[in-house]
Amino acid sequence: LADGGFATGTMMGSGGFIVLDEDQCVVKHTYTLARFYRHESCGQCSPCREGTGWLEKLLHKIETGKGAIKDIDLLWDVQRRIEGNTICPLGDAAAWPVAAAIRHFRDEFEWHVNNPELCLRENYGLAHYADELKVDAV
């Protein structure tokens, strides 16, 4: 199975895989993975320590409706600078899900950027972000 993931360019990190239906948000799940890897980084090498922090910050920005197209491009650049440049494989595992998500679902990232309020309303119900966005009275 892992070989198939490499062959299709869809590795989601450390050998695991996640199956999402069309109702799930790729950006939200990628952000969750980035948070995990940032937390797990020991901080010994700069590409992983700094890179995982940047991945988390940029994905949070996009997920919460504050992102721009340039943030998607920066995400791509950051993950490229992590992969292959760390002491242990955790950095690679952190970069792979971001690369796979952008490679296969860039349109969903762009949708988040171009429709922030709609995205939050449809995907997250605004309950978690109620203090950050102006919501129409019901």
Model-identified regions with their sequence ranges:
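Redox cofactor-anchoring modules in respiratory/redox and cofactor-processing assemblies
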Residues: L1-V138
